[in-house]
C-alpha cells in the first residue's frame, strides 16, 4: 500500500522539478540577497528572477509578488493587508 499523508498544513511533498531548480541555491549559490558582496548579488538576481517567473505564471506584476519566510509571516501579511484596505480608522485585532 502506498503512503497516505493527510497533514499538508504542516508539511507538503516537494515537486522534483522544484527541488532541481532550487538545488544550486541550497548547495553552492546561496547568499543573503540583502548583502552587497558577490554571493548576495547572485542571490538577489535569483530572487528577482523567481519573482518575475512567479508573476508571469500568475498573470501578476512582479512588484506585487512578496516572498515570506514562512506561514506565520504570510498570514500576518495577509491580515495586515486586509485591515489596511478595509479598516482605515485603526483599531485592534488579536490573532492566535
Which residue stretches match the model-derived regions?
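Pyridoxal 5′-phosphate
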Residues: 1-96
Amino acid at each position: 500500500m502506498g503512503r497516505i499523508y493527510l497533514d499538508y498544513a504542516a508539511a507538503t511533498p516537494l515537486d522534483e522539478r522544484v527541488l532541481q531548480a532550487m538545488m544550486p541555491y541550497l548547495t553552492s549559490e546561496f547568499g543573503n540577497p540583502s548583502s552587497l558582496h558577490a554571493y548576495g548579488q547572485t542571490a538577489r538576481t535569483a530572487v528577482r528572477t523567481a519573482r518575475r517567473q512567479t508573476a508571469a505564471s500568475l498573470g501578476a506584476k512582479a512588484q506585487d509578488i512578496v516572498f515570506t519566510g514562512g506561514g506565520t509571516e504570510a498570514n500576518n501579511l495577509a491580515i495586515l493587508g486586509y485591515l489596511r484596505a478595509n479598516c482605515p480608522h485603526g483599531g485592534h485585532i488579536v490573532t492566535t
